[in-house]
Structures are given as C-alpha cells and as structure tokens.
C-alpha cells in the first residue's frame, strides 16, 4: 500500500510539473466592463451576465473565478442615469493555443 501511494503521488507531481512547463494555468484579473444602472442586490449576477456576453478572449476554455460590481454614480452630462463597473477574474489553461 505504501508503494501505491508513493506511485500516485509521483504521477501527480509529474502531471503538475508538466502543466507548469507547458504554460499551466493563467489567471487574469480586473477585466473591466462598464454598464448602465446601479449594481443593487443582484450586482454579481449582472456582472456575470455581462461577462458571458462579452468574454475577454473567445476560443479559450475559461473558468470564471468571480466578479465584483462597483457603482460609479452619474455618467457624464451627455448621458443620463447611473452606471456601474464590473471587475472580473478568470483562469484558463495556457501554452498550447498559439
């Protein structure tokens, strides 16, 4: 049993090192999107909807880690109403897409 556990641990380490050498997991943060209206109680889902409508880089398999909604107040005088900003973080596998 001891050798089996060691073998599984060794395989996991090889897998981990292989991913790190080939680019591994790339984490991007602060993808910023602006939108109309205040955040309100459903600000997180508002940002998630916006994120999936305009993904940062199409063609990559992304794992969204989270979004944060921030009220910006009034827009410039040309526009009317309130606005918000969404900041999102996501991760994706890198290295082999080029």
UniProtKB/Swiss-Prot annotation:
Tagged with keyword Signal: yes
Alphabetical GO biological process terms: defense response to fungus; killing of cells of another organism; signal transduction
Segments passing through the bilayer: none
Disulfide bonds: 29-89, 39-69, 47-86, 67-88
Predominant localisation class: secreted
Cellular location(s): Secreted
Signal peptide region: 1-23
Highest taxon listed in the record's lineage: Eukaryota
Keywords attached to this entry: Antimicrobial, Disulfide bond, Fungicide, Plant defense, Secreted, Signal
InterPro entries: SCRL
Record-level GO cellular component terms: extracellular region
Family: Belongs to the DEFL family.
Record protein name field: Putative defensin-like protein 239
Species whose genome carries this gene: Arabidopsis thaliana (Mouse-ear cress)
